Amino acid sequence: MKSSIFIKSAIAMMAAVALGASNASATVVSREKVLLETVISAEGNVTQKGIIQRVKVSQPAEAKKNDKGVTGETGFGEISVSFSEPVKLKDVTRTEYATDTEAGAAVKTTSEVGMLLQTEEVEKHEQFVKNKWDLSLPRDVKPVSFDDGSIGFRTDTENGVSAVSETRISTPWAVDKHGNPLETWYEISSDGSSITQVVNTQDIEGEIVLDPRITYGQGVYYNWYGSELRTLKAESAASFALAVGYGCVNVNRLRHPALVAVAGLMCVTAGSVVGIEALRFALDNFKESFKDHSCYQWKFGSHHITPVAVKGNCSL
């Protein structure tokens, strides 16, 4: 009799535990569903209103989720963008998302695009919300801000030429719970290890969604001031041909500093100096005078040089 009572009690206890686990699981699923609905709605709103700035890359590289954010390969090496707060991202079955419901965080990857979506609760009269995103960058690569508010990645040399990856974090966006866009911008930390997204929330309260969107590409752009390009253009075609012959192994044997600088940078960022012949054609094709303090850009392998904004492209 006592044995029967014990068995019934054990079964009842197991049923209670199972029911508790089932309820807990249902709660997690419910939170996950709400979070996904929130971020998908926000993304849909900004897409429909044309707020999301799409970046086109010539050599797409796959954006991959990890347990902290997204990562991908560039011409400079691996670049990662992560949530600054601790998160435990878990893939959501049959979707492109990974989420952490406790942190209100989600990540989405589609081909070369990675998105980190964060929900924040804004209190009444709270003027600004600041959310930090951590960056993991290759050595000697730093984040730079462009005129449109987007973030790029650049490496500089001591001889004036710089290289910018086509990988870019788009102009930031943030929306309130009704899908209305909010004023927002990025600030780069002094050591380049993070960016902070600042959102103007002084006229709202309630939930907001904010997001950095990174597009990965392996293409590389090279930038000079006009005075430096003029020096490079003065080099003979034979010198450029010699650079190709030397290759990356013997690039330092070149005599001219301007040529050594760009050839060496090509080896580091594009893996080859062969494209320098195309640069020679691009210099010949540019018929205007190079202006000393203007910034000019050449895409690896192309036959054209174009003027670009100084900010973000040419080192200051």
PLM segments and residue spans:
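Soluble non-cytosolic domains of exported or imported proteins
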Residues: 125, 238-239, 269
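Bacterial N-terminal signal peptides that target proteins for export
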Residues: 1-10
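Residues that cap or anchor secondary-structure elements
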Residues: 27-216
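Alpha-helical transmembrane segments
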Residues: 17, 269, 273-281
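Short hydrophobic membrane-inserting alpha-helices and related fusion/pore-forming segments
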Residues: 243-272
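Secreted/processed peptides and extracellular or luminal domains of membrane proteins
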Residues: 21, 25, 254-257, 273, ...
